[in-house]
Amino acid sequence: FISTIYIGGGTPSAIKPELIKKILDKIYDVAGIEIEKNNGTSNGGKKVIGNEMPDKKEKIEITIEVNPGTTTKNNLQMYKNCGINRLSIGLQSTDDDILKKIGRIHNYEQFLDTYKWAEEAGFENINVDLMLGLPGQDIGILKNSLENVVNLKPEPKHISVYSLIVEENTKIEQRINSGELSLPDDEEERRQYHYMKNFLELNGYKHYEISNFAKLGFESKHNMNCWEQKQYVGFGVAAHSYVNGVRYANTTCLLYTSPSQRDRQKYS
């Protein structure tokens, strides 16, 4: 049976929510999943009612990643109505200057709007993404971001904190190479990591995985499935799968209409 569905990116919130619904409806139909909608109706599936897995007092976790710069109140309500019950919001920092430096299309105020709309739409399980090692970010700026996030009302149930990875041939790489931007050195990033870890643990978040912290009972099932080497199937460009002990990666080329059938890389 399916225990989790994760709609990641890229930026899923950049496409029309009707397309997200179409994808989910196809999964529900093929897997026989019945999702109870906010209005009390269902999609006519067979196996799962109210997002609950058969024969288990446990709900299917259905997550979507959203960018505050491409998210509307209406979109969030549509996500909720089609069965999504977990939201991951890509904030990265509450410092607007830092957000500009890394090319984010949103500011902190837009994040606050997104968070408020998510609560109004009925989302209780919300993750907030932050980042370490950002250009111009020191422990003082990181501390301010952490304080702002843990003091949100209601508090986020999950916080992820990742290190910045500079990809080749990107604008940020060009700006770093030209000397326009500079990154914290490894020692500074380590200090930021340990400061962040201690801060979140003191604020009641369990450090259950390298970059992830959760309130009790809100650990990401998707993350845990990956760490526990459970099987998962990825669909779409650059999606990864893990089946029968073998990891697969779909092509990153957008020219192929069937990326799962072309240039798939296999990892033993």
In which residue ranges do the predicted regions lie?
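C-terminal scaffold of the Radical SAM
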Residues: 1-39, 56-258, 262, 268
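Residue-identity detector for glycine
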Residues: 32, 40, 44-45, 50
